[in-house]
């Protein structure tokens, strides 16, 4: 993938850039692997906003991605097409299996049209192949990794992301995550070889608010610039600080609140945060 920069012919074009989509080999998805996708606009079943700044955007269809691949062990496949997926930053690859079935997978870097792909314990260590962690050599770069055996890929699925297999001991493998976190995962969990393609995605300059609206992202307005009727921080003469600790529009204190997960005990070293990121 390469990035094409626009000339500053208009204020919206100034500084903006776009992917050249050179790796895309087909513009229409496989019909049998597409499902309708209805936008919720950040609302729940009661019609109340539960996630702000969502809504609108271009109409999309959902592509069914095979995140497990455990029922195709030993069945060879070929990459028929590399396609665009509006629902994720990574590209997707359409596989044609020898038994006649078609499936989508996340397209890793280096995968091309016509490339052979396989899954199973005996698969070669090549981009796109899927194996259990116990069969992958230490030091290998992997993506689309499961957290629980048979649970489907959960980690390193976005464009340019990858995980490094640091070692294996007993029934656990040690992984270095994209965030820098080091954690242990069951060696029966499966992973795909290589790093996810389309790594230049993070360097795209969107240029104008309208392109964000096409993606279904709405404006984020600060509470201090609202009226008192709209937000607890609103109102006041001139510029004010809000006059209280940060709260949501509904008066609840702002800040991350997360419960500990059962899998947290498998974390060896936490990801770098705050000043430690540098």
From Swiss-Prot:
Function description: One of the primary rRNA binding proteins. Required for association of the 30S and 50S subunits to form the 70S ribosome, for tRNA binding and peptide bond formation. It has been suggested to have peptidyltransferase activity; this is somewhat controversial. Makes several contacts with the 16S rRNA in the 70S ribosome.
Ranges of Basic residues composition bias in the record: 37-58, 268-278
The keyword Nucleus appears for this protein: no
Complex formation: Part of the 50S ribosomal subunit. Forms a bridge to the 30S subunit in the 70S ribosome.
UniProt keyword Repeat, yes or no: no
Region (Disordered): 1-58, 225-278
Biased composition (Basic and acidic residues): 253-267
Family: Belongs to the universal ribosomal protein uL2 family.
InterPro entries xref list: NA-bd_OB-fold, Rib_uL2_dom2, Ribosomal_uL2, Ribosomal_uL2_bac/org-type, Ribosomal_uL2_C, Ribosomal_uL2_CS, Ribosomal_uL2_dom3, Ribosomal_uL2_RNA-bd_dom
Protein name: Large ribosomal subunit protein uL2
One of the protein's GO biological processes: cytoplasmic translation
Keywords: Ribonucleoprotein, Ribosomal protein, RNA-binding, rRNA-binding
One GO cellular component, as annotated: large ribosomal subunit
Gene Ontology terms, MF aspect: rRNA binding; structural constituent of ribosome; transferase activity
SMART domains: Ribosomal_L2, Ribosomal_L2_C
Annotated Pfam families: Ribosomal_L2, Ribosomal_L2_C
Domain of life of the source: Bacteria
């Amino acid at each position: 993938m390469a990035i094409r920069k626009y000339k500053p012919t208009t204020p919206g074009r100034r500084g903006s850039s776009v992917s050249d989509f050179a790796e895309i080999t087909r513009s229409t998805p496989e019909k049998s692997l597409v499902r309708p996708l209805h936008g919720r606009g950040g609302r729940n079943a009661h019609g109340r906003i539960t996630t702000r700044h969502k809504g609108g955007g271009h109409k999309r269809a959902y592509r069914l991605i095979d995140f497990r691949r455990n029922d195709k062990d030993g069945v060879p496949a070929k990459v028929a097409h590399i396609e665009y997926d509006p629902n994720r930053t990574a590209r997707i690859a359409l596989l044609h299996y020898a038994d006649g079935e078609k499936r989508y997978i996340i397209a890793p870097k280096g995968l091309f049209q016509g490339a052979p792909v396989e899954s199973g314990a005996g698969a070669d260590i090549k981009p796109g192949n899927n194996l259990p962690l116990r069969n992958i050599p230490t030091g290998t770069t992997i993506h689309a990794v499961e957290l629980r055996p048979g649970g489907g890929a959960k980690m390193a699925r976005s464009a340019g992301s990858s995980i490094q297999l640091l070692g294996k001991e007993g029934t656990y493998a040690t992984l270095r995550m994209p965030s820098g976190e080091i954690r242990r995962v069951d060696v029966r969990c499966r992973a795909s070889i290589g790093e996810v393609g389309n790594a230049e995605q993070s360097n795209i300059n969107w240029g104008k608010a309208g392109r964000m609206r096409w993606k279904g992202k709405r404006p984020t307005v600060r509470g201090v610039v609202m009226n008192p009727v709209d937000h607890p921080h609103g109102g006041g003469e001139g510029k004010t600080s809000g006059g209280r600790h940060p709260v949501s529009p509904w008066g609840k204190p702002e800040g991350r609140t997360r419960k500990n997960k059962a899998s947290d005990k498998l974390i060896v070293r936490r990801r770098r945060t705050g000043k430690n990121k540098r």
